[in-house]
Amino acid sequence: MIFMKIMIIGDGKIGSVLAEQLSKEKHEVTLVDRSGVRLDQSNNELDVMVVEGDGASREVQMEAGADQADLVIACTGADELNLLCCLIGKKLGARHTIARVRNLSLIHISEPT
């Protein structure tokens, strides 16, 4: 099995479940969130690295290793933020990105022109 470096932005319900499953599969997972409380809980319960900060910040993504990531997953509660995080991750060198988007009118933003 090929193990990946995966960065997950958003340590909410979806992000924490993804982090748990992916770390169980032995992927190298880094969680990014603004909430130190959530990250502390995840850090204590899961085999993950954590970075506290704004996932839409270039500096925070660099600290979290976006430039070396095989996959960046953005699953915060804000569609626009998820798209922005993925755009930044891709520009920094992430091989693949996935943005959680519920508003289908925003889908065109991430499509290649």
Residue ranges and their predicted role:
Residues 54-58:
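Conserved SAM/SAH-binding loop
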Residues 33-34, 111:
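Conserved acidic E/D residue at the C-terminus of a beta-strand in Rossmann-like folds
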Residues 22, 89:
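Aromatic pocket-lining residues of Rossmann-like dinucleotide-binding sites
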Residues 39-40:
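Short alpha-helix immediately C-terminal to the canonical SAM-binding loop
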Residues 105-113:
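Residue-level detector of conserved catalytic or cofactor/ligand-binding positions
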Residues 11-12:
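Glycine-rich Rossmann-fold phosphate-binding loop(s) that bind the pyrophosphate
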Residues 15-16:
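N-terminal Rossmann-fold NAD(P) dinucleotide-binding loop
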